[in-house]
Amino acid sequence: MTDSHVPHPESPAVEEGEERPHRRIKSFVMRAGRMTEGQQRGLDQGLPLYGLSLTDTPVDFDQVFGRSAPRTLEIGFGMGHSLLEMAAAAPEHDFIGVEVHSPGVGALLNGVLTQGLTNVRVYDCDAIEVLNRCVADNSLDRLMLFFPDPWHKSRHHKRRIVQPEFAALVRSKLKVGGVFHMATDWGPYAEYMLEVMSVAPGYRNQAEDNQYVPRPAERPITKFERRGEKLGHGVWDLKFEKVD
């Protein structure tokens, strides 16, 4: 019979009377993926040029980009198609992408290199850490969260990234007038996002009916989304503006 009081070998021992360290529930699962030649090129050549690392103090992004410009941060950019298209279409804007999966990071950076873009920077780590440690308060014009994992099962809802605490964190990083733009293709998650954001302090829903906005022209349609539309699947966009 195993002694239930023996600490896990990978965990530090906790003395009697001590509190166990709080482990934040993560909204993502690391998945292994095979790298294409282009993705590997993006990592090898692009990451040293355009990759950013976690810091203990907020980053001066004006210095990073060499200018002061409207600034967008996207969490979980996947393979980078939307972020790449948006950055190419708006060279007067600066874009910061955050993604934990290496093939996606490599794909985005390969595109950045191929197109010669200079207005994109990338973090390949946990977005919550990036927001907490690297992004100054009141510094973002827009934060985008497109098609995050909906965590369908009820027991996994706590893993959804959109939570009251996350809404407050995003608000602290947005400028007044800045926008938190979300999109999902899972109806129940759209309702959940709307419920969380509608009661989050300091935001205004930009939808005229306080529900969902029509698909904004600036958000590119992905191949996945086009396929879903043909099958009759819906997509819901939410835009909440920081008002104070």
UniProtKB/Swiss-Prot annotation:
UniProt xrefs under InterPro entries: SAM-dependent_MTases_sf (IPR029063), tRNA_(Gua-N-7)_MeTrfase_Trmb (IPR003358), tRNA_methyltr_TrmB_bact (IPR055361)
Region entry Disordered, spans: 1-24
Domain of life: Bacteria
Its EC number(s): 2.1.1.33
GO CC annotation, single: tRNA methyltransferase complex
Residues reported in the UniProt entry to bind S-adenosyl-L-methionine: 74, 99, 126, 149
NCBIfam families: tRNA (guanosine(46)-N7)-methyltransferase TrmB
Function (record text): Catalyzes the formation of N(7)-methylguanine at position 46 (m7G46) in tRNA.
Name the UniProt record assigns to this protein: tRNA (guanine-N(7)-)-methyltransferase
